[in-house]
Amino acid sequence: MRLEFFEVMAKKIHFIGICGVAMSALALAFKRQGWKVTGSDVGFYPPVSTHLKEAGIDFYPGWHPEKINKPDLVVVGNVASSTNPEWLYVQEHKLNYKSYPEVIAEYFVKKNSIVCAGTYGKTTSTALLTWILKEAGFDPNYMFGGLMAMPTNGAYINTPLQFFSSPSQTVPP
């Protein structure tokens, strides 16, 4: 049975590779929806580390399978090679996992979504479109791999009615 994003509260999710701009935005969106969020990566630097810390997300440097505490879902980033200890742990313990594109496709993209695609300017176009709609009185959901001058940075989830995305070549067909 498919879990609908807005029906699930107080779940646990772990991100392997949480420090990227897009993965951290996704982690922040789940946190704002009430999920317990944890993550790992090889390096943490401002402003991403600052946003994660301010949101109360537990994250740690390196790969430590023993710190993965029975999550309902593991999001596996591109940084997880076939020899990554956390990725091996997820497979060995048969934990529920998805890639970043799979999470976007399942939880965010709806039939009335708008995805800004192209070679250059996707993040800027998505942020500008989001700002225009907010100024016009709409409250769209959005997700993009960039840090903008918005209180929610690269992700905001309110309702499943409107969603804007900058896919960065990651949204499946």
Name each model feature, range by range:
Residues 1-45, 53-59, 70-74, 92-95:
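ATP-dependent carboxylate-amine ligase
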Residues 60-63, 82:
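Conserved beta-strand-loop-alpha-helix hinge of the TIR/SEFIR fold
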Residues 47, 63, 70, 151:
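Short acidic active-site motifs
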Residues 23, 45-46, 83, 126:
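Generic non-transmembrane alpha-helix signal with a bias for helix starts/N-cap capping motifs
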Residues 42-43, 64, 102-103:
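Short, ordered loop/turn segments at secondary-structure junctions
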Residues 4-8, 29, 53, 67, ...:
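Phosphate-binding loop of NTP-binding sites
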